[in-house]
């Protein structure tokens, strides 16, 4: 059976062979997202309860166990009764998602960005473009208001913004400045406070033969 792949760079998803798996309700997806965020580490049951509810109901522990059972059936539908789970496992005081590094889009994205830094400059733009293409929307989109996603959402978003700017900078250095301009324009329309992006845009315009536009950017 093919591996299950997970997405958190946008709405939380799980797929097998390109087919979406039914994850039931928002709290099921919240449990899955919280385990993905933990990066294969165990999340104690009481921590899951605190993260899912501001004021946990009396049967919150049982509810989390039900959510986990439902998720296991969705992720491993062919697992024999009473056989231990291989993907969403019970360990010590809680649960962990033992997904492979390539099976979570956020993990693949980070690995690709790191790889681009090691590649020859001529190969780096394509690698960064492929990495950025994995984003389908804001990270952990449906849980943007949750305290437990805040730090990771901020970190991933900053990594994405830097990847856009780094790709443009490399294109300029390679003499492909005109290719960098449209992406930087779109980037700065959405994130106008990015000073480094303005600097790279001014340089890209200048190198592309649009000196007046480049100077206008610097004078903004």
Residue positions per predicted region:
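A structural micro-motif at secondary-structure boundaries
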Residues: 8-29
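Intrinsically disordered, charged and Pro/Gly-enriched terminal/linker segments
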Residues: 21-22, 26, 34-40, 53-61, ...
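Short, surface-exposed polybasic/aromatic micro-patch for ligand or macromolecular engagement
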Residues: 13, 34, 42, 70
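Intrinsically disordered or compositionally simple regulatory linkers and C-terminal tails
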Residues: 1-3
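Short acidic, hydrophobic short linear motifs in intrinsically disordered regions
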Residues: 42-50
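C-terminal flanking helix
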Residues: 68, 72-79
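Residue-level signal for inorganic ion chemistry
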Residues: 48, 71, 131
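Short amphipathic alpha-helical interaction segments
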Residues: 59-70
């Amino acid at each position: 059976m093919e591996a299950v792949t997970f997405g958190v760079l946008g709405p939380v998803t799980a797929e097998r062979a390109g087919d979406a798996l039914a994850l039931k309700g928002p709290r099921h997806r919240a449990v899955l997202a919280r385990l993905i965020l933990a990066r294969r580490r165990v999340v104690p049951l009481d921590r899951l309860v605190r993260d899912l509810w501001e004021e946990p109901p009396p049967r919150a522990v049982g509810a989390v166990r039900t959510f986990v059972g439902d998720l296991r059936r969705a992720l491993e539908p062919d697992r024999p009764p009473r056989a231990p789970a291989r993907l969403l496992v019970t360990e010590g005081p809680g649960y962990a998602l033992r997904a492979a590094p390539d099976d979570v889009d956020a993990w693949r994205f980070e690995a690709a960005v790191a790889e681009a830094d090691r590649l020859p400059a001529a190969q780096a733009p394509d690698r960064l473009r492929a990495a950025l293409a994995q984003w389908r929307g804001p990270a952990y989109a449906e849980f943007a208001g949750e305290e437990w996603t805040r730090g990771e959402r901020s970190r991933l978003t900053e990594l994405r913004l830097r990847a856009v700017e780094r790709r443009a900078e490399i294109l300029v250095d390679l003499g492909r400045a005109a290719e960098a301009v449209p992406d930087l324009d779109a980037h700065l329309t959405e994130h106008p406070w990015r000073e480094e992006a303005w600097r790279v845009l001014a340089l890209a315009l200048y190198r592309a033969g649009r000196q007046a536009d480049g100077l206008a950017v610097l004078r903004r």
